[in-house]
Amino acid sequence: MAAPKKVCIIGSGNWGSAIAKIVGANAAQNSKFDKTVKMWVFEETVNGRKLTEIINTEHENVKYLPGHKLPTNVLAVPDLVEASKDADILVFVIPHQFIGKVCDTMSGNIKKEAIGISLIKGVDEGPDGLKLISDVIQEKLGITMSVLMGANIANEVADEKFCETTIGCKNKSHGPLLKELMQTINFRVTVVEEYDVVEICGALKNIVAVGAGFCDGLGFGDNTKAAVIRLGLMEMIAFARIFCTAGPVSSATFLESCGVADLITTCYGGRNRKVAKAFVKTGKSIEELEKEMLEGQKLQGPATAAEVYRILKHKNLIDKFPLFNAVYQICYQGHPVSEFISCLQNHPEHM
């Protein structure tokens, strides 16, 4: 009998805590996993107490997932190396802006044969353009990565409301174990091999959701939002066909939870849409609204739009992605939000 696998969750925000609820419960009842699940918590003080202390005594992340009890076998650890050094499975769930620094701290301090799964929605820039977050982790830590993406608004997952998700595996032999770690009766997992397409969907849909929020802020209706979703999906597929080079890009992957389902839920719920709507209504900057509305959580859509803009500019492809470009120009270049509607009206799909 193989020794039970030790699991560490890197991150403890809204999504990290929701996943800790699932992983903790599954590890507690499956002999393939060690009963204790460590969760690295970036230490902060909440009402005069350390967040790790609150989580370990009251079993609740009162800052990022209030009102939900975490399993008692989830142990909050403030030291990243201490949390991750013995893990066989590393679950990455932090804002994509922090991944480089986190991996640098872990480098040389983890098991060589560990495997990783990234739940991080975003992309990085490499010297030749696009770099996937899972590739950044793989290069820095030398471990084989998978990814998990889907229509998974964290609070609904924590409420155990039914949803689906997609795991993309670079090494398909890791799929069954990761599925056992993640799947519950209300969190259904499909495993596919196109890990790069799964991951790119998770990043790009946040840009489209910003556009959906602009439409809401301008008072347009569901027909307009449906057009944003459709045109956004077309740009996501076109982008994947250019930049996902690990293998063929099949349309079927976009019909998984990581694709069209995640795009829909994010364009109707989710923080990117909410903040983009407020951006139109208040005239405040994205940075101001992030501080005011998200209580320490990070917004992924505008930052991803900026990275994608630079990648497309580098490849001379900006004209082929007018929706992505418009979101960037409005968020960062002071262009009027009304430009977003003309971007839809004049989209090359209609020419």
Swiss-Prot record:
Chief place where the protein resides: cytoplasm
Binding-site positions, NAD(+): G11, S12, G13, N14, W15, G16, K121, A154, R271, K298, Q300
Annotated active site: K205 (proton acceptor)
SUPFAM superfamilies: 6-phosphogluconate dehydrogenase C-terminal domain-like (SSF48179), NAD(P)-binding Rossmann-fold domains (SSF51735)
NAD recorded as keyword: yes
Broad class of enzyme this protein falls into: oxidoreductase
Pfam families from the UniProt entry: NAD_Gly3P_dh_C (PF07479), NAD_Gly3P_dh_N (PF01210)
Gene3D superfamilies: N-(1-d-carboxylethyl)-l-norvaline Dehydrogenase, domain 2 (1.10.1040.10), NAD(P)-binding Rossmann-like Domain (3.40.50.720)
Catalyzed chemical reaction(s): sn-glycerol 3-phosphate + NAD(+) = dihydroxyacetone phosphate + NADH + H(+)
GO cellular component, one term: cytosol
EC number: 1.1.1.8
Compartmental location: Cytoplasm
Oligomeric and partner information: Homodimer.
Its biological purpose: Has glycerol-3-phosphate dehydrogenase activity.
The family this protein is said to belong to: Belongs to the NAD-dependent glycerol-3-phosphate dehydrogenase family.
Name of the protein in question: Glycerol-3-phosphate dehydrogenase [NAD(+)], cytoplasmic
Native species: Takifugu rubripes
Gene name of this polypeptide: gpd1
